[in-house]
Structures are given as structure tokens and as C-alpha cells.
């Protein structure tokens, strides 16, 4: 094939996504890889959708939080490039491996994913090699949903070791042009950061009272579905002992164009998730509606009548 798509299993793509990305690559022969606008389950934009080159200085400003304090300053915003409009096309140094459309010619020139990495860092490494091969990495503002991080808990020793191990591998591979003493200092900093993160994980596991979940409650769903599938969703809630007062709205994409956004903000109180029936709402419409209410922090649930499964970020209900 002419193109190769790297795609995480914890993603949801609108019906026209792949076609739109391929059309862009067909009209931009300099595009070696394309990434897209990734949304979290509550609709907010995931900044790792477009990233800068992770130099030691760039990584330091990220770790110290300076990129949040000065988001529009190029000096401090080199990691997430938040000064670049998330709703516009940009040529960027690094794309996320959760969704990466690759031109096979570029992949043949740059080489495949480096097996020295495991789970983290290989997308950054590949992005850099595609650029070195003479192609560009493009960020496209076409939204997809990324549940993100369900495969590995960030509160685990394994995550910390693998994540910072990948950082060390990347620097050893791409940082050979730095002076020896500087390289030693950077690697020592990575080891120190690993130790600090492992210590935090240890404390969280052994002193749970300090990090107990506050305000954690049973899911309460705001459900938009066809009348036919409403009974199936009710049955799923009952069989999983979801006893909160859920709200059901018989609707479809045409009759309820505004979806859950038709409610006044004060009426969102108490709901934790908005659930859409995928047989009457397209994925494109669902993501559009979710992004319009991201400040409400409602998590997205999707009911698939073909599999009779209700998918949420936390778990799947059958």
C-alpha cells in the first residue's frame, strides 16, 4: 500500500477521518506523516497531538511547569507548541503514535519503529527520522477520541520505569552531538527524575490516606438513544447495579441536533457521563457535541447496539 496507519486500539475515529487525511497527503507530497486533533473523553484537546523536538531544555521547561505559566512564549512552549492554533494545519517536529498516517516511501527512507523502545518514545524517534529523511510531519485539525493511557496505569512502577527508560534511550540515540559532560548531566537528571517518580508511586501505594480519591461517585448517565435501544441500555445499567438516577432522552442526530448541549449548564449538575447511541448518532456528530461542552467535564459513553456494549473511559458495561 501507499500509506500505513499507526492507530491505538483505544481510539474512536469519525466516519470521514481516514478519507480526509488521505486527501491531504495526496495533495501534499512533502508530507511524510500526518497526525490529528486528539480529544480526551471529556472533550478537551490533548496537547500531545502536536509537539516540538524534546531537547533537554524543552523537556526541562515542561517538567518544571514553565510551559503552563508562559504558554505563548516560544522559549518555554517548545514541548506542546500550545501557541499554535489547534484548529489549523501546521508542520510540526513530532506527532503522536496513537494516530500516525505514514507515507510508505517516507517510512522506507526513515526505517520502521525502533524496537529498542517499548510503548513510549518510538513515535518521537520515528517523527525525527521522517524529518531527517526530507519529509514533513503535519498536524491536521481533524478530531478523533483517544481514551489515552488505559493500557498502563501512570500510578505504577512499570509505567515510570518504561517511560523514563524510553527518555534515556531517545537521548542516547539523538543526543550524541552534545558534549560528553552535558550528556552525563542529562542522563543523571533522567535517573533522578525516575527515582523521584518511583518514590511518589511508593508513597501513594503505602500511604493511601494522603491520596484517597475525593468525591468519587457512582456513574450517573445522561443518555441519548433511540426508543428501541433505550430498553437495552436500561437493562445494562440494572445488571451492573448502576442505581443512580439516570436521565433518558429518546432522540437521534436529526431530531436533537444540539445533543446534550440543548440543556442549560445548571442542568448538567450530578451527571458524570453523557451516553450516545451510535446507531442514531454518527461518531462525527458525537465528537463535535462533546467538544462543545468540554468545560462541563462530562465523560463520553457510547452504546453500540451491534455488540450490546456500553463503553466508558473507566470500563465497558455488558
Feature map (PLM): residue ranges:
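The conserved acidic donor/metal-binding loop of glycosyltransferases
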Residues: 8-12, 278-280
